[in-house]
Amino acid sequence: MRKDERERDAPAMRSPPPPPASAASPPESLRNGYVKSCVSPLRQDPPRSFFFHLCRFCNVEPPAASLRAGARLSLGVLAAFVLAALLGARPERWAAAAAGLRTLLSACSLSLSPLFSIACAFFFLTCFLTRAQRGPGRGAGSWWLLALPACCYLGDFAAWQWWSWLRGEPAAAGRLCLVLSCVGLLTLAPRVRLRHGVLVLLFAGLVWWVSFSGLGALPPALRPLLSCLVGGAGCLLALGLDHFFHVRGASPPPRSASTAEEKVPVIRPRRRSSCVSLGESAAGYYGSGKMFRRPSLPCISREQMILWDWDLKQWCKPHYQNSGGGNGVDLSVLNEARNMVSDLLIDPSLPPQVISSLRSISSLMGAFSGSCRPKINSFTPFPGFYPCSEVEDPVEKGDRKLHKGLSGRTSFPTPQLRRSSGASSLLTNEHCSRWDRSSGKRSYQELSVSSHGCHLNGPFSSNLFTIPKQRSSSVSLTHHAGLRRAGALPSHSLLNSSSHVPVSAGSLTNRSPIGFPDTTDFLTKPNIILHRSLGSVSSAADFHQYLRNSDSNLCSSCGHQILKYVSTCEPDGTDHPSEKSGEEDSSVFSKEPLNIVETQEEETMKKACRELFLEGDSHLMEEAQQPNIDQEVSLDPMLVEDYDSLIEKMNNWNFQIFELVEKMGEKSGRILSQVMYTLFQDTGLLETFKIPTQEFMNYFRALENGYRDIPYHNRVHATDVLHAVWYLTTRPIPGLPQIHNNHETETKADSDGRLGSGQIAYISSKSCCIPDMSYGCLSSNIPALELMALYVAAAMHDYDHPGRTNAFLVATNAPQAVLYNDRSVLENHHAASAWNLYLSRPEYNFLLNLDHMEFKRFRFLVIEAILATDLKKHFDFLAEFNAKANDVNSNGIEWSSENDRLLVCQVCIKLADINGPAKDRDLHLRWTEGIVNEFYEQGDEEAALGLPISPFMDRSSPQLAKLQESFITHIVGPLCNSYDAAGLLPGQWIETEEGDDTESDDDDDDDDGDGGEELDSDDEETEDNLNPKPQRRKGRRRIFCQLMHHLTENHKIWKEIIEEEEEKCKAEGNKLQVDNASLPQADEIQVIEEADEEEEQMFE
């Protein structure tokens, strides 16, 4: 019985009956993501024949059934006629016909291929011209093509029959001209396009030549007739296909729409984005009314958007909460209502009945809020990246709106903002959604202070900033085990902290080494906090205790010392709820009724606490501005004692750095840090950015220890590059327009020691002054932050250099090459390793007084400057710099543009990195010796690995002169010329008389002429580029640049050495040629002797 019922109900289940037309929207239980609709059934394809596949192969649409039936009937009639003719003939006729057929077949077998080629040529030409003139489709504008074969061959046939002088072989050219004339007249009739007419003429000449040369087996009179016949057949076939068949590219003929009876009812999934989920009708469900959908909209229904909006509001709160009973009430709205009721209770003019009612409502809402428990947020929203804010007055924060939790570019809804009725003067501090590195989102109980009976968020909450408790490592590990990013550095977590014991208020906990967060940290690390600067303490005693504690909290992005904030103790004798709430504001009213007396006491308490807070803040700022005397004492005495002598040695382009290294002896390992400290003192960068000396020296000593003891790319090279960028940016430059004067570079700072908003600091060297207004200086046109980034980049630019080139690392699949995808491998490694060192320990944080935006800008500039030292990108930078600074159509360098200043700094560090050939001869040879030894070490390793030895790195065949000459000619020379042409090289004006100037010009011309007699044209051009004529200013003034002078002299010396080597090689070659005259006999004897020795060894 059950089986019969199931069989009877099965059809109803497969095709449920449609609902009545008058039915309203279906019940909510049926709206489960599926709708009833009707679809057209799939039709079975008809059987395919050979003719159908042939049409598909020819790219045409198969004909209709009626056309196919007529074609079959015609073929049948033709076959019957042929069969009847054969049956009615006599046997004798069959024999004669067979003999004639054999003769015809023997002749046609030799002519079949040319005839078929002619037919195909006419077929494809007709198809092309037909569709090119009209496009695909039916029409009657191309039937003139049927006359084309006749014009090609019938004219030739007539000339052959009636003009006997055209029958010889030499008259073939005349017959071809006759054919082309006939075809040309034919193309004029239908107004063929010019290119099509030319194509037809070329085609006619080609097919005539095929007929003339390929049909030699046929009689001469029969050749044009058969050619015309097959050509006409090809044209006719092409026109027939174009007339009776459709091209597949054309739109097919419209088909009749399916009737309602052909549709089958089905149940299908509903397209969520094409329905109005909160007000759709039955017609939309059953497919009777179409709802057009914009294809650009996301497939998300309105219910999903509402749920998403609500969930996102919860995620963006500092504490993700919801009611335990699952009632789905937004606690932020509930707490807003409680705040508004509490504000109304303060009004003394309200009647007692209203006050009683309001107190009852507040108690009910407080009881409901107290029953809610927080839930762990398993999602990590992206709150944006806020800069570190400075010390703010809590009173001023009360009327300020929260930061938006999400970027304005996205389409996500923003969290609900705090609203206040303004009926009371209570503080309404609003805490933004923050991210904590150590503990993620903490509960209020964990952040409160258990001693002294403190409670949280009562009506008398003062919301002062104190020191939070430290969460144990086991809790942090348990809570964030699944949320940490795979492969993250362990230093980015507080699990390595040595202190895990809760401390009392006013003390600080240990902090792990700082890290540099990026945007991915906010998505993968929910425990990152965006903090407040240090400056918010509850008392002066707490502040001094903090200064004595070395384990201070540091910002992970800008290095500021910070204090995390929690609520403090409340006055005794007041009951407060201990439960948490989901309100973003930290001032949540309790369930107990309030009165006016308590409110006045609260205001008095808040004023007292605020005065204490501001007092502690002032002490903090005073102490932060005072220099740390103990740290200065711990520094190396050499930094202070030899400052004057060291800066005097460095005030020269030819800084004798190797003599300084020998003088320092065992302390030469600290040359980079000492020179860096000296330069920062000279330029005033230590005072401008409030750089602590101890952290500064700690970092740069660790940085120079990371340089390897290799011949060239060591700490001495880094120090030389640092000196070069300092010299190029602080020495006087003739004719450079100076944007900021010396008195304008000293910017005034605020009372806290920081620059005011909108002010830009500029520096100047204490060891050098600008002689007059005809000189300028790069330090007056480039802000101090950018120059400091340039100096730091020079110190970092070859950190942890392995002594091998990028090409070697790529060829050997080194880990760095794999990590950086073979692009600027060493430069990326230097920058990343140097910044990793800076972020590894808090005692390296010498940039702690930079705000967030300054630090981000500084880091960007340092990385860009280091990456610019890649010689593979040398010519790209050179072309860009020439287009900006030296192009006649360019406006020159705009010092107000950050991009132009960045380009100047990049070219400056590039020039400093390869400044060896621009030094005097002794320094240049010392640097050349270092780079050559490093090259030879790489060549030895390449030979050991079986790799081809790179150019100039083979120790067995030294080419020192060619290496340096090529390096100067192609790399250093063009860069220095471009930098000099832009007017950025330091130098001095030289007063000369007209006669002296003329003589110097003549001497230069003579020198160039003498050199041109011995060198080729390329060397002459290079020599002219490296020997620029003295630039005359104001008639009798020219510029002398020490850098260009040394570069020119070194280049001349290397060229002379190359010439001497070439002459020596030529002399040795001539000697070898003279000696080789008697060598053949000796060679033969030597070969015979070797053969005899081999035979003796074989016999032995």
From Swiss-Prot:
Positions bound to AMP: H713, D798, D913, Q964
Enzyme Commission number, as recorded: 3.1.4.17
Domain PDEase: 627-1061
A GO term for molecular function: 3',5'-cyclic-AMP phosphodiesterase activity
Required cofactor names: Mg(2+); Mn(2+)
Chain intervals with Acidic residues compositional bias: 993-1024
Modified residues (Phosphoserine): S15, S273, S274, S421
Compositionally skewed regions (Basic and acidic residues) per UniProt: 1-11, 573-583
Annotated Mg(2+) 1 binding sites: H717, H797, D798, D913
GO biological process: angiogenesis; cellular response to insulin stimulus; endocrine pancreas development; glucose homeostasis; negative regulation of angiogenesis; regulation of insulin secretion; signal transduction
Any one annotated GO CC term: membrane
Subunit composition and interactions: Homodimer. Interacts with PIK3CG; regulates PDE3B activity and thereby cAMP levels in cells. Interacts with RAPGEF3 and PIK3R6; form a signaling complex that regulates phosphatidylinositol 3-kinase gamma in angiogenesis. Interacts with ABHD15; this interaction regulates PDE3B's stability and expression and, thereby, impacts the antilipolytic action of insulin.
Family: Belongs to the cyclic nucleotide phosphodiesterase family. PDE3 subfamily.
Protein name listed in UniProt: cGMP-inhibited 3',5'-cyclic phosphodiesterase 3B
Gene name of this polypeptide: Pde3b
